[in-house]
Design a protein with these regions (language model features):
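Acidic, low-complexity, intrinsically disordered interaction modules
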Residues: 17-76
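Residue-level detector of alpha-helical secondary structure
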Residues: 4-11, 42, 70, 74-77, ...
Length: 81
């Protein structure tokens, strides 16, 4: 199973569903590339997005899992599991 699928399964298992999106929140601080990831979301077309804020200017960012390396995804998974 790929790390992307492990993350998606984790969201489906533990996520909070609002009727459109399913979201999960980290169990510990998760910082990747100077941005703190605040939640992972499965969007309306079944893609996983990471919602984060920049540590310097606090601007919000959305990124898809493909925007991260496998090493970063393993770290993200560890923060959210």
């Amino acid at each position: 199973m790929t790390i992307e699928n492990k993350i998606k399964d984790l969201i489906n298992l533990r996520g909070q569903y609002d009727g459109v999106h399913c979201a999960i929140y980290p169990n510990k601080k998760c910082i990747v590339n100077g941005r703190e990831i605040l939640m992972l979301i499965i969007d309306s077309i079944d893609r996983v997005e990471a919602y984060s804020v920049d540590m310097n200017d606090e601007n919000p960012y959305f990124a898809y899992l493909v925007d991260y390396t496998n090493e970063e995804l393993e770290y993200i998974y560890d923060c959210f599991k």
